[in-house]
Amino acid sequence: MEESLWKTERVPGDVKLAIGRAGEGPDPVVCLHGITAQHRAFNAAARYFGPSRGLVGVDLRGRGDSDKPESGYSLEAHATDVVRILDYLGLQSAVLAGHSMGGFVALKSALMFPDRVRALILLDGGWPRVESTPSEMTEEERQEAAALEAGLARAFKRLDMTFESPEAYLDFWFPGQNLKMDDLPRDLADYYLYDLGEVEGGYRPKASRVAAEADSPSVSSTSPAAEEMRGVGCPVALVRASQGFFPGSDPLISDEVRDMMAGPLDIRTEILLEGANHYTMLWPEYTRVWAPEVFDPPFWSR
């Protein structure tokens, strides 16, 4: 397999963070992944736009090759880590791109540290916090909550599993297809390989279940409600997948939720990826659709 797109480094601190740099641009976009993922989720973006734009991919605490403490997980902790990374990189401010939970981290960073965040790219993440109690939820809100819970349950399940080979890990994600790593596009294969660490008896996902289970309620309880989003003072690009976690499922950000975001946020660019789901939107065929609309020219300078 070819050399990695990323040059990896460690950001010092009480919780050491792994980052990857793609390209040498002086103003890189800082990329934040989902709740059980890692920075290689942005491989396609790094391949197509790293050389010209410059990207920094982050392994959030508890994921990838970053440290995995037993406690200390929350949106606030991740936002503080983002600023620590900017300090390490010598950046006074940066554009943040966040997929899934990474979108919530990006929003929290913009609210907590407005002078450090110049623009946000929300990739199927960062929707408003639901303020209704379960008994007050509409039927649509209940269905959305159930779909989110089902998607997270599948992602969390693998964190307790040991796989005898990388191919067995692919069987978890693509059941019945008998795939080998060589069958996948190179950037996707690299994502799955980096996602695994060797353990006794085989391979295990690097993401910490403790981290994921702590961050999940933090997202649902401390992310901004629609009105609180008015505190985000920077321009926003919103990229949505037309499907949720599973093919054919309802999108995580529906048209109604999008309308709730459009009022308080300064959304300069909006893209709906027809045919993409929450995961495949980062694959090459869809990255080639949304990334030029965001980066070429940069939406925040239009």
Model-inferred region functions:
Residues A18-S71:
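Conserved HGGG/HGGXW glycine-rich cap/lid loop of the alpha/beta-hydrolase fold
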Residues A262-G275:
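Catalytic histidine neighborhood in serine/cysteine hydrolases
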Residues V56, L60-A97, T138-E139:
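Active-site loop/oxyanion-hole signature of alpha/beta-hydrolase fold enzymes
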Residues S52, Q92-T138:
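Conserved hydrolase catalytic core segment
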Residues Y194-G263:
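Conserved serine/cysteine hydrolase catalytic core
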Residues A276, M281-D296:
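Post-His helix in hydrolase/transferase enzymes
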Residues L123-F163:
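A catalytic-pocket lid/entrance helix-loop region that shapes and gates access to the active site
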Residues K157-A214:
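Conserved alpha/beta-hydrolase catalytic His-Asp/Glu region
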